[in-house]
């Protein structure tokens, strides 16, 4: 299954372009599912139908299905199940139960529902293409990072090796005077890890790409640069830039002429700066509604499968005595970069984005000897640690 993740600045038309992209693929004969968690059903408005917690077929387009998962229902079900499993702990604390009717979803519930829907769609194997309407770029990249981060937290808080001491838990509990983590907690952690790994597999699959939607102009240019850099930091490949709401030229109106001049400059700069395909979507003069309007947008088709982004390590030991780790970060600015070595991990910060990356095995026996940003690539030099590096005789 191919997956297209659409994001961009708020108000750029992401949901509409997600619907148009899905429509284009479906009319080409690809079984397609388009996902969104927008509470106001912007997806349904664009498609001319009502979407909801169950997938619905789009009338007149046999291969197109739309789905807007209900975060509230799933949140109530999950929290109710958690209360049932944590009965002993809640009783010990004297806590009262929350009834499903009084539960309202917490911030972030929509995003978690979207991740779960992505996993379910991939496991169903019912579709050839999954189009995901993501939140605005900063939230979208944080959302895509969430499965890996949660798995890291689970491994730190509930390491699997602790399960070997199950027989000692009752004794430890009496000594400590508090209940020890029960088997169900470790079982739940293992189940969560499997679910999160399934989402990570979809995000990191070579068939998954990011498409950025932005209006051409100064604000759009800043948003595109940040989005491409942030996506690259997560190891995600951006396959297309979509310039939305492009105005026709020329215009005799001075106000419109000024806007079109700004758009023209951005449309000239983007392909040269990022070496990515640029697809222009015309302004229809009104908000697109229904499949006819979506077809008029002429959304780009699904591109051929791309190769995944690689972070190779090159050997310069013979010449310079170092190994070099190459991390592609297109659009990155030197002043926005920061990196910190913490044990076997590298904490890499680029502007507002941060990622904790495990070091390749060879680099764990080295010390950081320097770094440089050249041609959109961060090159980190590692010198072998004499105390850890194998000695040659």
Residue ranges and their predicted role:
Residues 1-3:
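Extreme N-terminal starter segment of soluble prokaryotic enzymes
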Residues 39-42, 71-74, 136-139, 159, ...:
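Conserved nucleotide-binding/hydrolysis micro-motifs of P-loop NTPases
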Residues 40-41, 45-102, 109:
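P-loop NTPase motor core
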Residues 168, 178-179, 193-334, 343-347, ...:
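C-terminal lobe/tail of nucleotide-utilizing enzymes
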Residues 319, 340-342, 374-376:
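Structural motif
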């Amino acid at each position: 299954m191919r997956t297209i993740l659409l994001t961009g600045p708020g108000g750029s038309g992401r949901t509409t372009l997600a619907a148009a992209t899905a429509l284009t693929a479906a009319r080409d004969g690809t079984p397609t599912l388009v996902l969104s968690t927008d509470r106001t059903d912007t997806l349904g408005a664009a498609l001319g139908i009502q979407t909801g917690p169950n997938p619905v077929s789009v009338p007149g387009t046999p291969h197109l299905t739309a789905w807007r998962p209900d975060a509230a229902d799933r949140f109530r079900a999950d929290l109710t199940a958690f209360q049932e499993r944590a009965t002993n702990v809640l009783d010990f604390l004297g806590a009262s139960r929350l009834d499903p009717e009084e539960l309202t979803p917490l911030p972030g519930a929509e995003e978690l529902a979207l991740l779960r829907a992505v996993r379910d769609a991939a496991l169903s194997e019912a579709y050839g293409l999954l189009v995901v309407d993501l939140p605005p770029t900063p939230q979208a990249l944080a959302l895509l990072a969430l499965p890996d981060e949660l798995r890291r937290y689970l491994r730190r808080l509930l390491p699997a090796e602790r399960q070997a001491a199950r027989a000692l838990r009752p004794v430890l509990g009496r000594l400590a005077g508090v209940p020890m983590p029960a088997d169900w907690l470790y079982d739940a952690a293992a189940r969560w890890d499997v679910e999160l790994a399934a989402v990570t597999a979809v995000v990191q699959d070579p068939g998954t790409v990011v498409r950025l939607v932005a209006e051409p102009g100064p604000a759009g240019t800043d948003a595109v640069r940040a989005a491409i850099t942030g996506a690259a930091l997560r190891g995600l490949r951006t396959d297309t830039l979509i310039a939305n709401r492009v105005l026709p030229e020329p215009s005799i109106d001075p106000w419109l002429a000024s806007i079109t001049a700004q758009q023209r400059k951005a449309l000239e700069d983007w392909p040269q700066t990022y070496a990515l395909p640029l697809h222009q979507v015309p302004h229809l003069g009104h908000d697109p509604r229904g499949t006819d309007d979506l077809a008029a947008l002429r959304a780009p088709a699904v591109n051929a499968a791309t190769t995944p982004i690689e972070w190779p390590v090159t050997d310069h030991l013979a010449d310079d005595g170092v190994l070099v780790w190459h991390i592609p970060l297109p659009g990155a600015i030197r002043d926005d970069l920061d990196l910190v070595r913490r044990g076997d991990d590298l904490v890499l910060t680029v502007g507002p984005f941060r990622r904790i990356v495990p070091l390749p095995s060879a680099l764990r026996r080295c010390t950081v000897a320097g770094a440089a940003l050249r041609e959109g690539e961060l090159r980190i030099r590692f010198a072998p640690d004499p105390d850890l590096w194998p000695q040659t005789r």
